[in-house]
UniProtKB/Swiss-Prot annotation:
Keywords, comma-separated and alphabetical: Cell membrane, Endoplasmic reticulum, Glycoprotein, GPI-anchor, Lipoprotein, Membrane, Signal
Domain of life: Eukaryota
Annotated segments matching region Disordered: 70-145, 176-418
Record's subcellular location: Endoplasmic reticulum; Cell membrane
Annotated glycan sites: 31, 426
Signal peptide as annotated in the record: 1-22
Name assigned to this protein: Uncharacterized serine-rich protein C215.13
Bilayer topology: Lipid-anchor; GPI-anchor
Length: 534
C-alpha cells in the first residue's frame, strides 16, 4: 500500500510538472505565429538591424520601411512649436516638432500593445513602448503590531496610490506607494493609514528625470487603558530642468491618527487633510497625497474622514500629472457603528500647447470590506488609485495598482487565520519589462489581552514577451505581536502563472489577440494525490 501511494504521488507530481511546462511553452511558442519568434527576440536581445527598424517605425510610421510619406499610427498630428516641449520630437537638432497627444492613451504601432490596466477601482494606465516601472515595497513590523508595505491592508485600513509620468524616450519612471496600518486586538483598536506618492513631469527635450521618495512609519502600543498610533509620511519630488525658466515642484504630506482607549464610552474621530499646489510660468508638476486613520473604543461610533488633493498649474507647454488617493477606516469593539469617508481629488490646468492628464478617484469602504462582530471586531476600507501619462510616442509609462482586502474578527478565544487577496494585472509593450508590487494584507484578532497582526506581501513581477505574461508571485507572511512582543515570520512561495489578454501586431500589420488564463499552484500536487488515493 505504501509503495502504491508513493508511486501515485510521484506520477502525479511528474504529470503536473510536464503539463505546466507544456502549457508555458505553448503559450510562449504556440500558435503558428509564435514559431517565428527567435530566442533572442523573446529575451529582448534583438539584432541591431531589428532595433533600428523598430525605431524608424516608432518615430516615422510604417511608411519609413518603404521610404514613403510618414504615417502616424495612433499619434496626434504633429504640430510645429517654436519653443521646446516635453512632447517634442526633433527631426534635426534645430527643428522641433511637438506631438501633442490628448489625454487618451495610444499604443505603439510597432507592437500595438493596447494600454490596459485591471484593478477593482479605476486606475488608469497608458503604455507605449519600452520603459520600466518600479514600485518599492517595505515590510517592517514593529514590536507590537505594525505593518508597512505598499498598497496594503492590515487589521483596519488599506490604501494604495501610484502615479507615474514619463516624457523623454528611454526615461524610466519610478513610483512608490506605501501604506501603513496597525491593529490591536483589544476592544480599542487603532489604525493608521498613510500613503505618499510623488510625480514630476520632465520639461526639457534633452533631459528628463522622475524621482520619488516616500517614508512611512507606524507604531502602535496597545494596553488595557489606551492605544495610540501615529503615522507620518513625507514625500518630495525632484525639480526638473527646463530650457526656459527654471521650474521645481515639491509636495509633502503628513498624516496622523487618533487613538482611543478601552474606557466605557468614548469615541474618537480623526481627519487629516493634505494638499499641495504649485504653479510657475515654466513647466511644473506636483503630486500630493494623503493619509488617514481613526480608531475607536469599547462603546460605539468612530468616524474617520480624509481629504487629499493635489493641484498643479503652469502657463506654458507643460505636462502635469496629478493624482491622489486615500482611504480611511475605523475600527471598534462592541456595539460598533463605523463611518468612513474618503475624498480624493486632483486638478491640473496647463494653458498652451500642452498635454495634461489627471486622475482622481474616491471610494468609501463600507460596501466593500466591512466586518462587524460582537466582541472586538474591525472593519476596513480599501481604495486604490493610480494614473500614468506618457508624452512621446517613444517613451512609455506603465503602472500597477493593487487592491487589498482583509477580514478580521475575533471572539473571546478564537483567532482567525490570515486571509489575503491580491488583484494585479499589468500589460507592457513587447520587450519591455515592468516590475511592480501588489499585495494584500490580512489581519487577525485574538484574545482581549494578546495583540496580533498578520500581514502578507505579494510581490509580483511580470515580463511580457510578445503575447504572454508570466507572473511569479511570492507570498511572505509576517506575524508579529503578542503579550511578550515576540515575533515570527513565515515565508511561502507559490507559482502563479497568469497568461492574460494580450494583443500584438506583426510587421505586416495583421493583429492577433488571444486570451488564456491558467493558475498552477504547488498545492495541485497534493490535491491530485489525494484524489488518486481516494
Amino acid at each position: 500500500m505504501g509503495l502504491r501511494l508513493l508511486f501515485s504521488l510521484i506520477c502525479v507530481f511528474c504529470i503536473s510538472n510536464i503539463f505546466t511546462q507544456a502549457f508555458l511553452v505553448h503559450q510562449i511558442y504556440g500558435n503558428s505565429s509564435f514559431t517565428k519568434i527567435s530566442l533572442n527576440q523573446l529575451e529582448g536581445r534583438d539584432s541591431q538591424e531589428e532595433l533600428q527598424r523598430r525605431q524608424e517605425i516608432r518615430y516615422y510610421g510604417r511608411a519609413a520601411e518603404t521610404g514613403g510619406t510618414p504615417t502616424y499610427y495612433g499619434y496626434a498630428t504633429p504640430t510645429s512649436s517654436s519653443e521646446p516641449s516635453i512632447f517634442s520630437e526633433s527631426a534635426t537638432p534645430s527643428e522641433t516638432n511637438s506631438y501633442s497627444s490628448p489625454v487618451s492613451s495610444y499604443s505603439d504601432p510597432a507592437t500595438s500593445q493596447l494600454p490596459s490596466s485591471t484593478s477593482f477601482f479605476s486606475p488608469t494606465s497608458s503604455e507605449y513602448t519600452p520603459s520600466s516601472t518600479e514600485s518599492s515595497s517595505l515590510l517592517d513590523p514593529s514590536s507590537v503590531s505594525s505593518a508597512i508595505l505598499p498598497s496594503s491592508t492590515s487589521v483596519e485600513v488599506s490604501i494604495s496610490s501610484s502615479s507615474l509620468s514619463s516624457s523623454d524616450p528611454l526615461t524610466s519612471s519610478t513610483f512608490s506607494s506605501l501604506s501603513s496600518s496597525t491593529s490591536s486586538s483589544q476592544p480599542s483598536v487603532s489604525s493608521t493609514s498613510s500613503s505618499t506618492f510623488s510625480s514630476a513631469a520632465p520639461t526639457s527635450t534633452s533631459s528628463s528625470y522622475l524621482s520619488s521618495s516616500s517614508v512611512v512609519s507606524s507604531s502602535s502600543s496597545p494596553s488595557s487603558s489606551s492605544s495610540s498610533t501615529l503615522t507620518s509620511s513625507s514625500l518630495s519630488t525632484s525639480s526638473i530642468p527646463s530650457t526656459s525658466s527654471s521650474s521645481s515642484s515639491t509636495s509633502s504630506s503628513l498624516s496622523s491618527s487618533s487613538s482611543s482607549s478601552t474606557a466605557s464610552s468614548s469615541s474618537s474621530s480623526s481627519s487629516i487633510i493634505s494638499s499641495s499646489s504649485s504653479s510657475s510660468s515654466s513647466p511644473t508638476s506636483t503630486s500630493s497625497t494623503i493619509s488617514s486613520s481613526s480608531s475607536s473604543s469599547s462603546s460605539p461610533t468612530s468616524t474617520s474622514s480624509t481629504i487629499s488633493s493635489s493641484s498643479s498649474s503652469s502657463s506654458s507647454f507643460s505636462s502635469t500629472l496629478s493624482s491622489s488617493s486615500m482611504s480611511s477606516s475605523s475600527s471598534f469593539s462592541s456595539s460598533p457603528t463605523s463611518s468612513s469617508s474618503t475624498i480624493s481629488s486632483s486638478s491640473s490646468s496647463p494653458s498652451s500647447s500642452s498635454f495634461s492628464s489627471t486622475t482622481s478617484s474616491s471610494k468609501s469602504s463600507s460596501s466593500f470590506s466591512s466586518t462587524v462582530s460582537s466582541s472586538s471586531s474591525t472593519s476596513s476600507s480599501t481604495l486604490t488609485s493610480s494614473s500614468s501619462s506618457s508624452s512621446r510616442p517613444a517613451s512609455s509609462s506603465s503602472h500597477s495598482s493593487s487592491l487589498s482586502s482583509h477580514k478580521s474578527s475575533s471572539s473571546s478565544k478564537s483567532s482567525s487565520a490570515p486571509v489575503s487577496s491580491a488583484f494585479y494585472h499589468n500589460s507592457t509593450s513587447s520587450r519591455s519589462s515592468s516590475h511592480s508590487s501588489s499585495h494584500s494584507l490580512s489581519s487577525l484578532s485574538s484574545k482581549p489581552i494578546l495583540t496580533a497582526s498578520s500581514s502578507s506581501l505579494l510581490t509580483s513581477s511580470s515580463h511580457t514577451y510578445e503575447r504572454s505574461t508570466v507572473y511569479v508571485v511570492t507570498v511572505e507572511t509576517v506575524s508579529s505581536g503578542s503579550s511578550t512582543y515576540a515575533s515570527q515570520s513565515t515565508q511561502t512561495s507559490i507559482l502563479l502563472v497568469i497568461v492574460g489578454d494580450s494583443s500584438s501586431t506583426d510587421s505586416s500589420g495583421a493583429s492577433s489577440t488571444h486570451s488564456k488564463t491558467s493558475i498552477f499552484f504547488s498545492l495541485f500536487v497534493v490535491l491530485a494525490a489525494a484524489i488518486v488515493i481516494i
